[in-house]
Regions:
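P-loop NTP-binding site
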Residues: 1-137
Length: 137
């Protein structure tokens, strides 16, 4: 998905049980922090989420790396509306216990489908996540 997650909804999702899921890991973005890449990692009952950097779409192009590898990466992930922002989380689990359809539905319910109608209004959404980065004075 390309749309951002609602911060409260995805935070609640991260703190719920995921029956049959053994491991998950991936990247995400939330409407209240459009410049930052969030990372989620789960093993068993332990779930960790943190900021790991900025999306390239928020970095001035004169600071982008040069070369065919980076260009190929941008070609693969770039979207005219969202840049390189995306939701990309992988779930690994027991086939007999993990309900992939349910996980997808629960994640889809966390997306802000009409984000592009007024992005600024969603930047001020309630955000229960801890601070990811401190500003250096």
């Amino acid at each position: 998905a390309r749309e951002p997650f609602d911060p409260s909804k995805i935070h609640n999702f991260f703190n719920q049980e995921w029956p049959g899921v053994i491991r998950s890991k991936g990247f995400f973005w939330i409407s209240s922090r459009p410049e930052f890449i969030g990372e989620v990692s789960q093993a068993g009952a332990f779930v960790r989420h943190q900021g790991i950097g900025r999306w390239w779409t928020t970095v001035p192009k004169d600071r982008w790396p040069e070369g065919p590898d980076f260009d190929a990466l941008m070609d693969k992930y770039w979207n005219k509306d969202f840049g390189d922002r995306r939701q990309e989380i992988v779930f690994i689990g027991l086939k007999s216990e993990m309900n992939e359809k349910n996980i997808r539905e629960r994640l889809d319910a966390c997306l802000i489908k009409n984000y592009l109608e007024d992005p600024n209004s969603y930047h001020k959404a309630v955000d229960p996540f801890p601070v990811w980065f401190q500003k250096v004075a």
